[in-house]
């Protein structure tokens, strides 16, 4: 087995996951998407981050 | 036992192949921007940039720490500190002047956070890859990283599932430096660690190679751009846990027992497309960017490393620990160390000390796990 096989399997794994998720998740809507830049948008940042404290119990 | 690294001769891709792949990548990015929204296309592109920079300049976080500990080579660690300082120079004013539009990687210091960072430091040396490093290495054909990655994701899901319980063991409020004085303290702290690294390092190891300088410029620029686009700093491990959460929910699991995954924001992300999740997109980009560099270099013909069974088993366990501990620690080298310190979070400094101590143990463990020859 060579490194190319590992890359191929990794990329296939990602593609299959994204494909399955695309089929099972809420549909995408570019007209409801946030603007390109959060900076200057006037909208609060809502993305998830690993450093965000957990929700209060 | 060490890895076999003999490269097989392979010819680099030709002009037509390279052009076709670049056109395909550009089409994919534009397609995502059109289908999901411009921000998401941009985040995938930024993630690819991170992957290109890390793999292209052979820069990272785990290797430089290893070389500092084993060889007293301070150059990589110094490059990391300079990169964080550049990000902080831009991030602090952005955070101060833009209210809710921009948020930092601010997390509380706690018992589980410190323990998590220590375990993460040890595990990343076993796998030879942190959060970004595991993704980049998997994307460039490293079998150890590719095996560790799914278990990293499972661990990240599990750590997030139990996160509220762990933080209840003892945790301070979130403490973050801000404004000019906060920036000055951050830069002074980075400089102090840099001086310490130079003093402890071998003679002339403070000289930073040109490729590290290029990596520093690229990573800092991309990290600042990420902050402006996403409104939050670069992170890695949330996305990995989300992938598993999506998988278990698709298989019928009920996550209402987890305060973390049942929280409205996280529950919403489980049902939303992964193509709208910030960290997932940059994670995909890291893998894709690294794969592109590896293919471009014609470096995919090398055989994968040969290790004993116990080494592969160790990689699986270390992968699980990487994921679980990084959630307890509120981030990996990227989310906690790089972005935490770069946006003023005190937990980033504590994370650095704990993870560096853990790295020392991880390096000592590698020979006993069959991942390298005993010295």
Predicted regions, residues:
Chain B
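Membrane-interfacial helix-loop segments of redox and metal-homeostasis proteins
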Residues: 2-375
């Amino acid at each position: 087995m060579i490194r190319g096989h590992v890359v191929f399997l990794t990329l296939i794994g990602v593609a299959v996951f994204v494909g399955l998720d695309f089929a099972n998740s809420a549909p995408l809507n570019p007209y409801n998407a946030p603007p390109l830049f959060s900076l200057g948008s006037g909208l609060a940042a809502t993305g998830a981050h690993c450093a965000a404290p957990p929700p209060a119990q | 036992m060490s890895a076999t690294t003999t490269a097989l001769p392979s010819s680099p891709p030709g002009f037509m192949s390279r052009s076709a792949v670049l056109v395909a990548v550009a089409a994919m990015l534009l397609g995502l921007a059109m289908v999901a929204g411009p921000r998401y296309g941009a985040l995938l592109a930024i993630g690819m940039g991170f992957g290109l920079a890390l793999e292209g300049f052979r820069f990272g976080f785990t290797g430089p720490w290893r070389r500092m500990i084993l060889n007293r080579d301070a150059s990589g660690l110094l490059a990391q500190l300079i990169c964080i300082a550049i990000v902080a120079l831009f991030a602090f004013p952005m955070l101060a002047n833009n209210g809710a539009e921009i948020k930092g990687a601010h997390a509380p210091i706690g018992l589980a956070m410190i323990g998590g960072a220590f375990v993460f430091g040890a595990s990343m040396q076993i796998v030879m890859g942190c959060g970004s490093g595991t993704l980049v290495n998997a994307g460039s054909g490293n079998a150890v990283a590719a095996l560790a990655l799914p278990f990293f994701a499972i661990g990240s899901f599990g750590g997030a599932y139990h996160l509220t319980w762990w933080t209840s063991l003892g945790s301070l409020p979130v403490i973050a430096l801000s404004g000019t004085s906060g920036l000055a303290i951050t830069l002074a702290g980075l400089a102090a660690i840099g001086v310490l690294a130079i003093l402890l390092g071998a003679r002339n190891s403070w000289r930073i190679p040109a490729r590290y300088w290029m990596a520093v410029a690229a990573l800092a620029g991309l990290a600042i751009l990420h902050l402006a686009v996403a409104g939050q700093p670069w992170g890695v491990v949330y996305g990995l846990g989300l992938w598993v959460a999506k998988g278990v929910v698709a298989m019928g699991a009920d996550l209402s027992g987890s305060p973390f995954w049942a929280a409205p924001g996280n529950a919403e992300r489980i049902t939303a497309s992964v193509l709208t999740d910030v960290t997932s997109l940059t994670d995909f980009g890291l893998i894709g960017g690294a794969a592109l560099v590896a293919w471009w270099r014609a470096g995919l013909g090398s055989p994968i490393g040969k290790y004993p069974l116990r080494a592969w088993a160790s990689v699986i366990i270390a992968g699980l620990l990487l994921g679980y501990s990084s959630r307890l620690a509120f981030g990996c080298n990227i989310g906690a160390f790089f972005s935490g310190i770069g946006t003023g979070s005190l937990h980033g400094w504590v994370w650095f000390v704990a993870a560096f101590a853990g790295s020392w143990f991880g390096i000592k463990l590698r020979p006993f796990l069959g991942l390298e020859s005993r010295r």
